[in-house]
């Protein structure tokens, strides 16, 4: 039986998985680093890389035990080799290549985005081609998935990724990290029409997106509600920049102090009802933007493919776990005769099962990678063969 070992370390989750040729997930271990990064309000690349270094052995041991698999039974090792935080990518890739060399088994370098792109084929056996909305903390793009390694980017964000925007707005509201799930929960209790936020380039006529202006609008609203002037805010930003330059050993103390300051500002001026309304209005605006862009993406997709027997839109990445957006985008897709498909929640966020599956497809096509492959911090889906 073919068994593919997958390794994922592109951001702050250390993940290892084993799947079979029949798309059965024998084990899928994820070691989260959320508590290590929470005090900073975001992912610190150096901490992430060091944690991957200490977590990979543990994750591999647990996966082998849970799947009742011996290392010699592994057919190939697939590992995220970009894009992502380069320190973590290198740690995972080197770990995988060491196993490959020792076991004399093929190594397969996987583009992290391809892992997300193919997840629906792992879970639902979706045929090619299909339209993909990849929405995560680091990326937001519409992609025509025409076949293995054949991707056409129809449009992408020109500034912030949608998941990053969720996290930053959550941070403004003093919500826990990661911010996406926190925003979603608060939004359930708020009025989505309480505040009107801008929808940048929503009428551009193409598939590109922008979230920076929306993020700024939320920040401005919060400052106005808190009656904090721009000078004080700019001073706080300059303090933040100075703090970043301090020694790593002092960072925890500095960020704790900064977070306490932010906490006092939010808790003093914004009650729970206001926070809920901001979260709901923000999430509603995101839904409006993505729904409009899905329509643009469908038109662009239909210009480059003539396969209309299976009209599927896949949403993948961490943002795909948002139930509100699932419902909004599903209704939008139905209007155009498409079915919206999204992976189970545990496969929306970063995981190694998707990496192992991408490895399986490449293994079946004998697309192996030399051990001298250089990991990449940036690696477009359209350049996946380079």
From Swiss-Prot:
Cofactor(s) required, per the database record: Fe(2+)
Q: Where does the chain cross the membrane?
A: none
Q: Which UniProt keywords apply?
A: Acyltransferase, Cytoplasm, Iron, Metal-binding, Transferase, tRNA processing
Residue positions binding Fe cation:
112, 116, 350
The main enzyme category here is transferase
EC assignment: 2.3.1.234
Task: Give the matching Pfam families.
Answer: TsaD
**Span of the secretion signal?**
none
List the SUPFAM superfamilies hit by this protein, alphabetically: Actin-like ATPase domain (SSF53067)
Q: Please give the InterPro entries that the UniProt record associates with this protein.
A: ATPase_NBD, Gcp-like_dom, KAE1/TsaD, Peptidase_M22_CS, RPE3, TsaD
What this protein catalyses is:
L-threonylcarbamoyladenylate + adenosine(37) in tRNA = N(6)-L-threonylcarbamoyladenosine(37) in tRNA + AMP + H(+)
For this chain, the family text in UniProt reads:
Belongs to the KAE1 / TsaD family.
HAMAP family attached to this UniProt entry: TsaD
Q: What is this protein called?
A: tRNA N6-adenosine threonylcarbamoyltransferase
* The organism of origin for this protein: Rickettsia akari (strain Hartford)
